[in-house]
């Protein structure tokens, strides 16, 4: 099934699921796989995930819940929502929905929770597929512990936080102690997000089953390597450098040359806004606490 005529359906954080989606009986009749993604841009690594899903479930429908104009990095996406949705559809997705910005720019836990909650509300997604660097048997017990931590775990976590470590680092070190045979797994970026997906499924009591796909290549490398699966970061760097030959090789298709929104596109507007704000106003924004507002204002001078 290929719904190239479908465009993105847009959600607000409190909106009901669009009736057009709920009435797609052809999706309800199939095994349906959900993917929470950004596709900035869609590249061969993402195509590998599609291929693995099709290998396991040849007749499955793939639904992509994709970030819109802004990504989890906090910067605008290089390509428009419609351009990225079209790339996903042309490479095998059956439907693309937009992940609300309120979830798309959040930390990993809330990015995952927001995405999983929307796929759950559709009512016909059977599996949640995501990339990992380790097996599900390593990650699932850790996710269960994070979602329902015992007092010993919480005590060790608090001790690392009190020592000045970030929450992510503290969590990773505490998991290392509990699962020493898999200690490296808890610091790998795709595993960290995978843990959040598993926690979200458990928290929501979802009937969706996890479908992890092992990642190939370094998905966070700064440069492209011939013959390897690329990182989105390296692909974006080649695009910004206008190395379209390398970008095409990494993505497997001809990328549109315009319009592109570079990460610096909003710099002047952001600086203007920051230079006209007070610390009290900045503290009204999510996560802008513990002196971060002062550091931002100092950097904006």
Language model segments and positions:
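Short terminal hydrophobic/aromatic SLiMs and anchors at protein ends
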Residues: 1-6, 11-12, 17
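Active-site cores that bind ATP or allylic diphosphates and position pyrophosphate for catalysis
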Residues: 9-11, 23, 99-301
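N-terminal catalytic cores of NTP/NDP-binding nucleotidyl/phosphoryl-transfer enzymes
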Residues: 26-84
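A glycine-rich helix N-cap at a beta->alpha junction
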Residues: 86, 90-100
